[in-house]
Amino acid sequence: MNPLISDFQTPQQRTPVIVALDFANEKDTLGFVRNLDPTLCQIKIGKELFTATGRSLAESLINQGFKLFLDLKYHDIPHTVAQACKVAADMGVWMVDMHASGGRRMMEAAAEAVAGYGTKPLLIGVTVLTSMEQSDLAEIGLNIAPEEQVIRLAKLAQSSGLDGVVCSAQEAAPLRRELGQDFVLVTPGIRLDVAGNNDDQRRIMTPAEALAAGSTYLVMGRPVTQAANPLAVLREVNRVANLEAN
């Protein structure tokens, strides 16, 4: 456990921050995680790191007290996705995601697979990747605005038993109106300063903007992992979250 434990989180409070551990290997990941505090953030492992390190690193991080978002974006036949979700639940994973475009039967199978667990992972649907624009959707045969496709897939995910969706912060407000206050909205593309940002996530917002728009969790990678003082960044985002909640 990191010794720099803060008193931020009470039973009535939660941190909205999910730190994306976009490292290439276990050594760099564990070296960085020593700078974090499990009461100030959740953490996320994606395809590159999980492929490189496998289950052992994920379980090590969970054993250190972190809530883990396993970001593997499952998209397969219903049985395969259901079995993968059961494995994630057995590991103690806090959140796992899948492409909502995999369809109702796939998502319902996933929800049924983890329903019997006392503490089950949150099941999150991936709607439209934040790197995609309308021209990208058109190239795959979807002549629809990204925000319309997000709402369509989010409604499908909710009615199929999922707990929430990944969406850009710009879609958070309309999704709140459509799907209610209890549906989880996980928002990537969060930057401390959006000015001059030209990275691979097109629809970005600051933490304050995203929380005001209705996001539940904020995925932050480089703004935390490349910060001189990651804990200071986390404390500031959590301070903003408290202001938005009050």
UniProtKB/Swiss-Prot annotation:
It catalyses: orotidine 5'-phosphate + H(+) = UMP + CO2. SMART domains: OMPdecase. Pathway: Pyrimidine metabolism; UMP biosynthesis via de novo pathway; UMP from orotate: step 2/2. GO terms for biological process: 'de novo' pyrimidine nucleobase biosynthetic process; 'de novo' UMP biosynthetic process. Its EC number is 4.1.1.23. Substrate binds at residues 22, 44, 71-80, 130, 191, 201, 221-222. It holds the Pfam family OMPdecase. It is an enzyme of class 4 (lyase). GO terms for cellular component: cytosol. The keyword Electron transport does not apply. The active site is at 73 (proton donor). Keywords: Decarboxylase, Lyase, Pyrimidine biosynthesis. GO terms for molecular function: orotidine-5'-phosphate decarboxylase activity. NCBIfam families: PRK00230.1, pyrF. Catalyzes the decarboxylation of orotidine 5'-monophosphate (OMP) to uridine 5'-monophosphate (UMP). This is Orotidine 5'-phosphate decarboxylase. It comes from Neisseria meningitidis serogroup C (strain 053442).
